[in-house]
Amino acid sequence: MNTSTVSPVVDLVTRARSAQRVLDSYTQDQIDLLTQAVAWAILEPSRNRELAELAVADTGLGDVEDKVKKNYRKTLGLVRDLNAAKTVGLITHNPEIGVSEYARPVGVVAAITPSTNP
């Protein structure tokens, strides 16, 4: 891997770790609002189209109109799935065995996205 590839990745990971430090103190309500804000930002029609156009231009695959629809459906589905999910703080407590489960941000998650599903 050459430095022109590594440098942007290092910059992104640094920014993600900085964001993680901020999110460490967020409550469940704040995380829920953040999740909804990100979803609505993606669903905003001009931004959705921009993302769809970028995906088609970057991969050479698909059709912009189909990508716009897919972005819309998948984003709404993800928000629906995350809506009632506990993601920070106390998740479960079992007093019978004295075990409590807590969730918190633990690190940066990165993935290589298949070009067929950007």
Regions found by a protein language model. Name each.
Residues 1-100:
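N-terminal Rossmann-like NAD(P)+-binding subdomain of aldehyde/semialdehyde dehydrogenases
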